[in-house]
Regions:
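Short glycine/serine- and small hydrophobic-enriched flexible loop segments
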Residues: 102-105, 155-162, 234-244, 299, ...
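Bacterial N-terminal signal peptides that target proteins for export
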Residues: 2-12
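Substrate-binding cleft of carbohydrate-active enzyme catalytic domains
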Residues: 92-121, 143-191, 221-238
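Bacterial N-terminal signal peptides
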Residues: 12-21
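Boundary at the C-terminal end of the N-terminal hydrophobic targeting segment
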Residues: 24-26
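Alpha-helical support elements that line or immediately flank enzyme active sites
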Residues: 90-123, 293-305, 352-365, 372-375
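Extended, well-ordered alpha-helical scaffold segments
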Residues: 33, 37, 48, 52-60, ...
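Extended glycan-interaction surfaces of carbohydrate-active proteins
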Residues: 40-91, 114-144, 189-223, 262-347, ...
Length: 439
């Protein structure tokens, strides 16, 4: 049976045959290196889900197939870009690549392992792992050698090992984590405790949250950022657990994780609002702003059980804040600075996925299921309206044309965007959280 026939069969009965033409056209651009990944994802799209989600998953499979290119530079394996529709052209890496690995690990574990190796292959002697990797006229990779990015890649490495049992791969990952920790400790530590991103001093957007509201008013000196602290805790925690798995000393990593966890719980938590904030605003009520980054201690497991439940119930599931018709809003609806621009309000599916992972971590499968189902429903509706996968979405199901990105020639969200849309992973976690029986 050829692929187009398989797609027609999968679309039968879901009232979406008209979208089959879109999927078929997308298939025309699939690369030689991307075809096996696309085929595996088409197969995954046949797993139990809501029928209304299947057309967008099949389209997403084609986008993955169009985004894999031959090995070049320090990439020893074919590499996957962040999507064919990104306005900046072909780009590799950043947090987008982690989301793509979440999306493809069940369909093609080998592809995920190779993308991790490609990413770690660019690690500098000082420990920095390149963030946004661009390509010059000859197709060779280049990046800024002073700017990092959130080190969430470790979670995708662990997911790969869980999927395959390839524990030996952790040797490569642990070596990279040790060096990356060294870079963060040398370059991004705050006197007195915690870590920060370079966004604190300039518009570098090292955090990946371009033009986020937290940096509208900056402190006079480096201070602990809630997201950076959470992400470095993630490094310490993984370094400790991987060391144990490989029968190597773990005590130092455990001690560092424990100390940073206590710092986050005590110094970045506000008991009045039941939310986490940056160090320079947490004790200043007039400066506190409800931005989604306050969920990160829950996502990484640094919050106490009580703190996590408050974040989930009072904020993530609050329809006046983050639980919008398309969740999650990146800035609470109740926040005066909420607007339909970039990370200042719109919904990004990748962050809904991270929020759901945090809910599951603290035993709230019910909350994860609600977040994921609502986001996938909304994404499917928008796919039916516009026939594409968007970089980010209107949190209240309004027209995408109302959204703004940055004041450039293309001040709208990118179309055909992979990096922030781990829809296969979201559907899988939804199943695990009780959405449908897992088969």
């Amino acid at each position: 049976m050829n692929l187009r026939m398989k797609i027609r069969i999968l679309l039968c009965g879901c009232g979406a045959l008209a979208l089959g033409a879109l999927v078929a056209r997308a298939a025309d651009g699939v690369t030689k290196d991307g075809a096996p990944l696309r085929d595996a994802l088409v197969q995954e799209a046949s797993r139990p889900i809501k029928p209304a989600w299947r057309p967008m998953l099949l389209y997403l499979a084609e986008l993955h197939g169009r985004s894999v290119f031959p090995a070049t530079g320090h990439f020893k394996y074919p590499y996957e870009s962040i999507g064919p529709g990104y306005q900046g052209g072909r780009v590799f890496g950043h947090i987008d690549l982690t989301h793509e690995r979440f999306d493809t690990v069940r369909a093609s574990p080998e592809h995920v392992r190779n993308q991790i190796r490609n990413e770690l292959g660019g690690q500098q002697a000082d420990g920095l792992i390149p963030g946004i990797v661009l390509f010059d006229a000859e197709g060779q990779p280049r990046w800024k050698n002073f700017k990092g990015f959130p080190p969430i890649w470790v979670v995708s490495a662990e997911v790969y090992v869980e999927q395959t049992g390839d524990v030996d791969f952790l040797n490569e990952c642990l070596a990279a984590v040790r060096k990356q920790i060294g870079w963060f400790e040398a370059k991004r530590s705050v006197p007195g405790g915690g870590f920060y991103y370079l966004d604190l001093t300039a518009n570098t957007w090292e955090s990946g949250m371009d033009e986020g509201i937290r940096y509208d008013e900056r402190p006079p000196a480096p201070a602990a950022c809630v997201d950076a602290c959470s992400h470095v805790y993630l490094l310490y925690d993984h370094a400790a657990r991987w060391s144990k798995n490989l029968r190597e000393p773990a005590a130092d990593w455990e001690a560092k994780a424990r100390a940073l966890r206590e710092f986050i719980r005590k110094e970045l938590w506000d008991s009045e609002t039941g939310f986490f904030f940056d160090q320079w605003t947490v004790r200043r009520p007039a400066r506190r702003q409800l931005a989604f980054e306050g969920m990160w201690p829950v996502v990484v497991g640094a919050a106490t059980a009580e703190q996590a439940q408050r974040v989930i119930d009072e904020h993530l599931l609050n329809p006046k804040e983050f639980f919008t018709p398309h969740p999650i809003a990146t800035v609470a609806l109740s926040e005066p600075k909420f607007e339909l621009r970039m990370w200042r309000g719109p919904a990004w599916n990748c962050m809904t996925y991270w929020a759901a992972r945090g809910c599951v971590r603290y035993g709230r499968r019910d909350a994860a299921r609600q977040l994921l189902e609502k986001a996938l429903d909304a994404t499917a509706v928008e796919f039916g309206r516009t026939g594409t996968i968007w970089e980010f979405y209107h949190p209240s199901l309004g027209e995408q044309s109302l959204l703004r990105r940055k004041p450039t020639a293309q001040n709208t969200p990118s179309r055909d965007y992979l990096g922030h849309n781990p829809l296969f992973a979201m559907a899988d976690l939804w199943r695990q959280a009780g959405g449908l029986p897992v088969k």
